Structure formats: C-alpha cells, structure tokens
C-alpha cells in the first residue's frame, strides 16, 4: 500500500502521470490513488491537467460511443 508521500515523490520524479500509471507503478488500487491525488490537490500540492480533445475527428465527444475516453487527465506537482 502506497503512502501520500510516495505518490508525491513519484510525481516529483516523473513530472506528470495519469492516475492509472501511478496505481500500476505503486501497486495500489486505483480508487486509493484517486483519493490520494484529490487530497494532494486539496492541500495545494498537486494539480489536475485535462487535455483538450483535439484528437477527436468529429468534434462531438459528448455523443461519442466511447464516452469521454478521449479526454485524458494528468496529474503533476504544483
């Protein structure tokens, strides 16, 4: 089980990462990593970066059958 400090240190070493990457690297369940990232965000230590859906060919992600799979969410230290 990873700690909040390990999540912070991993972000410091790698720059920015997806929550799934952090979960896999630290062998910690995704919901736990999501909670830790939200805690770091509320403490002002981490920031959520959402990419624009520029890869969407039709430009209509709301009606996309994959939902919002094209919207990537990254995390980085502030």
Curated annotation (Swiss-Prot):
InterPro entries in the record: FeoC, Tscrpt_reg_HTH_FeoC, WH-like_DNA-bd_sf, WH_DNA-bd_sf
Molecular function GO labels: DNA binding; iron ion binding; iron-sulfur cluster binding
Keywords: DNA-binding, Iron, Iron-sulfur, Metal-binding, Repressor, Transcription, Transcription regulation
Annotated SUPFAM superfamilies: Winged helix' DNA-binding domain
Coiled-coil residue windows: none
Top-level taxon of origin: Bacteria
Binding site for iron-sulfur cluster: 56, 61, 64, 70
HAMAP family: FeoC (MF_01586)
Cited function: May function as a transcriptional regulator that controls feoABC expression.
Annotated family: Belongs to the FeoC family.
Protein's name according to its UniProt entry: Probable [Fe-S]-dependent transcriptional repressor
Gene: feoC
């Amino acid at each position: 089980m990873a700690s909040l400090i390990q999540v912070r240190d991993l972000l410091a070493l790698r720059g920015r990462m997806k929550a799934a990457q952090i979960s896999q690297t630290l062998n910690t369940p995704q919901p736990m990593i999501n909670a830790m990232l939200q805690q770091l965000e509320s403490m002002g230590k981490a920031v959520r970066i959402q990419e624009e859906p520029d890869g969407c060919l039709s430009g209509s992600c709301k009606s996309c059958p994959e939902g919002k799979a094209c919207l990537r969410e990254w995390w980085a230290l502030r």
